Regions:
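A domain-level signal for the structural core that forms small-molecule/cofactor-binding pockets
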Residues: 1-150
Length: 150
């Protein structure tokens, strides 16, 4: 199951901040969900008629805003940051490191365009990473299947 997380300073989630700056973290997350849904990668199936396929299955995407407390840059309480994490299984053929790098660039560009010159924003970072099932990742569906089998 892929995950999309938008990490936002908690004070930027308040109505007064939204009213004074126009920044709406919920709208940004909704926009990023659409961007992720549109991400494509080369079809790994040889000879397939479709040259590209979706990078993730949107119906499986879990997404959330994660509020950050005491979130500063370089010890400066006047400087804040946004961070986006997209995690998707590495067991999907074709979802290579270069695909993840391209996805990170696309997501970063979209956040940059969305926030514009937001006061106090010092940094936007994006991390597109693997979910490696061989390294301790499990899902509810997998655990239920295992329990019912034995």
């Amino acid at each position: 199951m892929p995950h999309l997380r938008l990490y936002v300073p908690e004070e930027w989630l308040r109505e007064d901040f939204k009213a004074s700056t126009g920044f709406d973290a919920g709208r940004l997350l909704d926009h990023l969900v659409r961007v992720v849904a549109d991400l494509r990668m080369e079809n790994p199936a040889p000879g397939a008629p479709a040259k590209e396929v979706p990078m993730i299955n949107l119906s499986n995407l879990k997404h959330a805003i994660v509020p950050l407390t005491h979130a500063h840059v370089g010890g400066d309480p006047g400087q804040r940051f946004l961070h986006v994490t997209l995690a998707a299984g590495n067991d999907t053929p074709g979802r290579t490191a270069s695909v993840r790098v391209r996805a990170a660039a696309v997501l970063g560009d979209e956040v940059d365009r969305f926030v514009g010159d937001l006061p106090g924003l010092a940094s936007v970072t994006v991390h597109v990473k693997d979910i490696d099932r061989d390294r301790g990742y499990s899902t509810t569906a997998e655990r239920k299947k295992r329990r019912s089998a034995g």
